[in-house]
Amino acid sequence: MNLRDFFVITTWWGKILGAFFGYLTAGPVGALFGILVGNFFDRGLVSYYSNPHWLYHAEKQRIVQKAFFEATFSIMGHVAKSDGRVSEQEISMAKSIMNEMKLSKGQKDLAKRLFNEGKQADFNVSLALIQLQRICKDNRDLLKLFVDIQYRAAQVDGLSSQKIHALDNIFTHLGFAPLHKQYRFYEDFGSYFQQEQSKQHYHNQQEYKHTSSSQGQQGYKPQSPPNTLAHAFALLEVSPNANKQEVRRAYRRLLSRNHPDKLIAQGLPEEMIKLANDKTHQIMKAYELICETKGW
C-alpha cells in the first residue's frame, strides 16, 4: 500500500488521534471535540490524496527527474567527445560529479553508460535536447542548472572551438543565448577568448606585414575578459550600474529560484542537490563581493 492508498482507504486516524489527545486534555468532552477536529483532518487528507492532480504531479516529477538525469550524462559525453577525444580530466570531472551526487553503484553504472552513449557518433543530440526542453519547459531554473553543469564539465581541460560549438547548440536548443553572450561564463571563457583573439591578431599581422608599421600597429588587439566584479554582476543578472536595492532584489530572487528544495519540487533529482548548493554558493559569493566593493 502506497502513501496515497493509505490516506484514501484509511480514513480514521485523525479521529482516533483527536479523541486520544482530547481525552488526555479535557476528558470525555475533550475526546468528543477531538473526534470532531480529527474528522475534518481525515476529510482534508482524503480530499488531497484523492485528487487526481496529486498523482499527476507526482508522476510528472518522476518523468522530469529521469529526463534530467539521463540528459545530464549523455550530453556531457557528447560535449566531451566533440573535439575528437575524451581527456582524462573530462573523465575525472564526470566521476567527480557522480561522487558529488552520491550515486549508488547502480546509478553510477547507468551514468557511465549514458556518458558512453553520448560519445557515439550516432548519438542524436538534437532529439535528446528537444525531449529535455519539452519535459522541463515549465522549469526554466532546472534548464539553467543543466547548462551550468554542462559548461562546468566542458571547461575542465580548456574550451576548444568544437566544444564551444557543442555548448552553443545546447544553449540555443534550450532557449538560451550562445556562449559568447552568456556573461556569467566570461570569467572562464575569457582565457579561450584571449587565445583566439591573439591567434587572429597574429594572422592579421602576417597577412598585412607588407603594410606600413603604423598600419600594422593599428591591427586588431585582443580584448581582455571582464573583471571579477563584472562577473559577479553577471551572476546576479543585473547591470553593473544597478543600485543597492536592485542588487538586493536580484540576489533574493536568485536565491529563491535556485533553492534546492524548490528545484527538487520542480523535478531536480535529489542526487543533484550538491550541484544546486554549489550554484547557491556562487550567488552568495557574488553578492558579498559586490557589497564589499561598493561599501554597502
Swiss-Prot record:
Residues 40-296 are cytoplasmic. The chain crosses the membrane at residues 16-39. One of its GO terms (cellular component) is plasma membrane. Residues 211-221 have a biased composition (Polar residues). Residues 231-296 form the J domain. InterPro entries: DjlA (IPR023749), DjlA_N (IPR007791), DnaJ_domain (IPR001623), J_dom_sf (IPR036869), TerB-like (IPR029024). The keyword RNA-binding does not apply. PROSITE patterns: DNAJ_2 (PS50076). SMART domains: DnaJ. It comes from the Bacteria. Keywords: Cell inner membrane, Cell membrane, Chaperone, Membrane, Transmembrane, Transmembrane helix. The keyword Metal-binding does not apply. Residues 200-225 are annotated as: Disordered. It is a single-pass type III membrane protein. One of its GO terms (molecular function) is protein-folding chaperone binding. It is found in: Cell inner membrane. Regulatory DnaK co-chaperone. Direct interaction between DnaK and DjlA is needed for the induction of the wcaABCDE operon, involved in the synthesis of a colanic acid polysaccharide capsule, possibly through activation of the RcsB/RcsC phosphotransfer signaling pathway. The colanic acid capsule may help the bacterium survive conditions outside the host. Homodimer. This is Co-chaperone protein DjlA. It comes from Legionella pneumophila subsp. pneumophila (strain Philadelphia 1 / ATCC 33152 / DSM 7513). The lineage of its organism: Bacteria, Pseudomonadati, Pseudomonadota, Gammaproteobacteria, Legionellales. The gene is djlA.
